[in-house]
Design a protein with these regions (language model features):
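Conserved alpha-helical substructure of the radical SAM core
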Residues: 102-213, 220
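Non-cysteine beta-strand/loop elements that form the S-adenosyl-L-methionine
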Residues: 233-243, 262-266
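Phosphate-bearing ligand-interacting subdomains
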Residues: 20, 32-101
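Structural motif
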Residues: 4-8, 30-31, 53-59, 77, ...
Length: 333
C-alpha cells in the first residue's frame, strides 16, 4: 500500500495500517523529503504500482494525478474512521522537515475535517465547499514585508463594512448546502472592533459547521467580544511571532473559557507577495496553479467571492486587470 501525503493525516493512516496488518511501502509527497516513521517518502512519479490511500482534505487535488499515474485510490477514511488514536505520540514532518507536535484534540479535529470533506466529495449532488476565508479588515498590527495577503500595500487600510458582510453571509448560505469552515482573516481580525458581531452571524448559520479565527496574538479580544467567541463552532489558530506580545494572556483566556485553539510558531517564510508581470507561458501558469497551496482558499471580500486571498487583495488594490470571470458577485449568484 502507498500513502499520498506525509502530514499528520498520513501519519495516522500509517498507524492505522500497521494496526490492521496492512503493509505500507512508501509515502508520496512533493514537499516533504526523507522518511516518516521509517517509511520512505518519494514523488508520485517514483512510486511503485499499486493501491494508494489519499489523505488530503482536498481529495480532488490528489485524484487527477493519481489516476494519470494509473494507481488505484482509496480514501484514507477507509482505515482511520474508527481508529483509536489514544496513546499515540503524534509527530509529523512538516514542509521544512522539522517535527511539529499536535495535541490529541487537534488531531481529532483534523481527522473529522478530512473524513467530512472526503464524504462530501463522494456525494457531489450536494453543493458544498471546504472553506471560505472571510476578510473582515485590511488593517493589521504587523507590517510583514512579504505578507501573502498583501496587507503591506494598503496605504489607508479599512475594516470591511459590517452590514455588507452580514448580508453576504446570509446570501451565500442560502445558495450553499454546506460550508464546512469559515476562516476569519485580516489583516489582524481583532483590529475590527465589530468582529464579535460577525462571529455571531457565522455561528448562527446551521450550514456553517466551523468558524476559525486566525490571529497573530498581538491584540486581546475586548471584554464584550468574549461571549460571542465562546461557541462550540469557534476555534482560534494562533501564529506565534516575536511580536506576539499577547500570546500568553490570550492562551490563558482561551483555556479559561474553554475555547479550542491551536498555537504554532512561524518557523519559516514564503516569499509570495510579488506584484509584477512574469511573462509566463500558459503551461507554466497551469503548473504554478496546480502546486499553489492557496488555490482552495476561496475568499469573501466586499461582497465578492474570489479564488484565494491573494487574488481578492490584488483586485482590491487594483493591481491586476478587473476580469469578471475571476470572481463571483455573491448578490448575483
Amino acid at each position: 500500500m502507498i500513502i499520498f501525503g506525509a502530514g499528520v493525516i498520513g501519519e495516522i493512516t500509517l498507524h492505522a495500517c500497521r494496526k490492521r496488518g496492512i503493509p505500507v511501502e512508501c509515502f508520496v509527497d512533493h514537499r516533504i523529503k526523507g522518511e516518516l516513521l521509517g517509511v520512505p517518502i518519494v514523488t508520485l512519479a517514483a512510486a511503485p504500482d499499486g493501491d494508494i490511500f489519499l489523505t488530503s482534505p482536498n481529495i480532488q487535488d490528489m485524484i487527477g494525478p493519481v489516476e494519470e499515474r494509473g494507481l488505484r485510490w482509496q480514501s484514507c477514511g477507509d482505515v482511520i474512521k474508527d481508529f483509536d488514536i489514544s496513546g499515540i505520540d503524534f509527530q509529523s514532518i512538516n514542509g521544512s522537515n522539522q517535527s511539529s507536535k499536535y495535541s490529541i484534540e487537534h488531531v481529532k479535529y483534523l481527522i473529522r475535517t478530512c473524513l467530512h470533506l472526503h464524504d462530501n466529495h463522494m456525494h457531489p449532488e450536494q453543493l458544498t465547499v471546504q472553506s471560505i476565508d472571510l476578510m473582515v479588515t485590511e488593517r493589521c498590527s504587523m507590517k510583514c514585508r512579504d505578507c501573502a495577503n498583501l496587507m503591506q500595500y494598503y496605504e489607508k487600510p479599512e475594516n470591511a463594512d459590517l452590514n455588507e458582510m452580514l448580508q453576504t453571509i446570509d446570501t451565500i448560505c442560502e445558495k450553499m448546502d454546506e460550508i464546512y469552515e469559515v476562516r476569519v482573516i485580516g489583516g489582524e481580525p481583532f483590529m475590527n472592533k465589530e468582529l464579535h458581531l460577525v462571529v455571531e452571524a457565522l455561528t448562527r448559520q446551521e450550514k456553517i459547521k466551523k468558524v476559525a479565527i486566525f490571529t497573530n496574538a498581538t491584540i486581546m479580544p475586548r471584554d464584550e467580544q468574549w461571549p460571542s467567541l465562546q461557541h462550540e463552532k469557534v476555534r482560534f489558530f494562533i501564529t506565534e511571532y516575536l511580536q506576539s506580545r499577547k500570546l500568553q494572556p490570550l492562551i490563558e483566556q482561551l483555556e479559561k473559557r474553554g475555547i479550542a485553539y491551536v498555537s504554532e510558531k512561524a518557523n519559516g517564510w514564503t516569499e509570495c507577495a510579488s506584484l509584477e508581470k512574469h511573462d509566463r507561458t500558459v503551461p507554466e501558469q497551469e503548473a504554478i496553479f496546480r502546486s499553489c497551496c492557496a488555490k482552495n482558499l476561496a475568499t469573501l471580500a466586499d461582497g465578492r467571492l474570489y479564488r484565494c486571498p491573494f487574488s481578492a487583495n490584488a483586485f482590491k488594490l487594483h493591481a491586476v486587470p478587473d476580469y469578471s470571470e475571476d470572481y463571483l458577485v455573491v448578490s448575483d449568484a
